[in-house]
Amino acid sequence: MIILKRNIVFLLIIIIVLGIFIATSIEIKNYKLSLNQNKNEISKNPPIWPAPFYGQFGNNSILISKEFNFTIISDSTLLLNKTLSKYYNLIFTQDNLINSSSNTLNKLNINLKSKNEILKFGFDESYKLIIKNNENSKLEGNTVYGIMRGLETFYQLIKYNFSDNSYFIENCLPLIINDKPRFPHRGVMLDTSRHFYSVDTILKVIESLSYNKFNTLHWHIIDSQSFPLSSKSYPNLINGAWSKSEIYSYHDIKRIIKYGKENGIRIQLEIDMPGHAKSWSVGYPDLLPHGWNDSTTTIKCPDYDVPLDPSSPLSLPISFGLLSEFSGTDYGYNPNYDDKSNNLFNLTVDDLFHVGGDEIEYQCWNNSKRIKDWMNENNLKTFQDVAKQFQLKIIKQLLKIGKIPVLWEDTFQLFYKDLPKDVIVEIYHDQSTAINATNNGYKIISSIARYWYLEYSYSNWIRAYNFEPTLNISKSNIHLVLGGEGAIWSESIDSSNLFQKLYPTSSAIAERLWSPIYYTNLLNAKSRLQSFRCSLLKRGINSAPLNNSSPLSAFSCYNS
């Protein structure tokens, strides 16, 4: 009996080992098959992230001479020169002892086709990079932003040999890359209300986004918990900030927008309304519903999520004033500020403006006699009618001042087919809402929480990489998917752990939004992402390891 049991155990072990071997063989076979089927899918060497639209690679290498320079062969701009200088300094941080010769790479010709530097939705980021030999190497872009994306690719191609103090490009020449993004809107949302981030931290976020070939920082600047936005139209609003030192001044905002342009990153502001408005009331108490915090009522209003009172005589003027002030326009809603000499109304902000519209707690309006009387006067039957009227006025105001309204999906669910078609809907609950919105002709931005919310403990790069934002959307509606965003909600995140939460998961989102849809091979992606993570660490971006929130033991970054 004992011998029989041992034989059974031995047989089970053999079956398990054989099963693992077969599964591994199938996985490797499928991996090779995937690479063979997708002829454009980039090899693990060179490990470019995000993968380009098209790449053709040889097997040769080349040394880079110490005389190497970027040679502009077209018209130049200050921003182009600044970008080239930035990447030169990022690349060449060590001694280079290689003299120039006919066998070394001595220059990269830069051809800028247009001096147009307007940074708005849909701007051109395409580029072409050719490296054959010293006499036939160039980077070409229709705009300086295409040159930026191409320089990031060039940066990732270059390696350094400490044994002979040389820079080189390895085993991929001759090289031709034709690259462009799959989606026009690719970003990360950063919540600066739950925790305040310094301007320098936000600038570092912008820089890291450019390395990932993102193009948008969605700045969720205010919320219920704090109001750190300094308004010269309504200066008492900053009384809702966490402290007097945790405020974004007008100068700070201009600095962030300027740095965004220098890195090819649009800054899309979000001023969430009418929900999440408790912090507004610290400076202007009449903005909230009377009786919202009445402890004697049976229907309680959550004190962290109190909405504006649309019946308040201040609600629309302050809301319109903020939209006008931070859109760079003035339509008479800024009574406390009429001195335009200091460029308050010259903010260069994005053409998309996010106004929230999510999670309106209707029970907070239920305890207010003023709201109910106002509803009767205006023939509004339900609190949904109240929300619709307010939101429609905000949407029309944004369109009046030349901005494209973006709202969370709650507003689409509130209006359904009656929502103006100018509105872009940001989807965060479920893909079924994305399908429903696009079937009804609405443009969408995808930010599905279970895949692309970065603060969750289960958030990881594989989960993010495997989500396809066009999943089950009809072919005729694919054009309505404008792109997507990873989201950082900051209840449990501050400057101490921000970048570990951002990366590498956001990098996976970056490739999903930039690269062709057929890039789905996880083995290939893991190899390239490990290399890219090392390049982030080298540049001071503190990305977490791929498989854990912190290192488990001693390893090279290429194996973490």
UniProtKB/Swiss-Prot annotation:
Glycosylation sites recorded in the entry for this protein: 59, 69, 81, 99, 161, 293, 346, 366, 436, 472, 547
Cited function: Responsible for the degradation of GM2 gangliosides, and a variety of other molecules containing terminal N-acetyl hexosamines.
Biological process, per Gene Ontology: carbohydrate metabolic process; glycosaminoglycan metabolic process; N-glycan processing
SUPFAM superfamilies documented for this protein: (Trans)glycosidases, beta-N-acetylhexosaminidase-like domain
CDD domains: GH20_HexA_HexB-like
Enzyme class (EC, first level): hydrolase
Subcellular location: Lysosome
Organism field: Dictyostelium discoideum
Keywords: Glycoprotein, Glycosidase, Hydrolase, Lysosome, Signal
Active site: 359 (proton donor)
Pfam families (UniProt xref): Glyco_hydro_20, Glycohydro_20b2
Protein name: Beta-hexosaminidase subunit B1
Domain of life from the UniProt record: Eukaryota
Record has Transcription regulation as a keyword: no
N-terminal signal peptide: 1-25
Primary localization: other
Family according to the record: Belongs to the glycosyl hydrolase 20 family.
A GO cellular-component term linked to this record: lysosome
InterPro entries given in the database record: Beta_hexosaminidase_sua/sub, Glyco_hydro_20_cat, Glycoside_hydrolase_SF, Hex-like_dom2, HEX_eukaryotic_N
GO MF term (any one): beta-N-acetylhexosaminidase activity
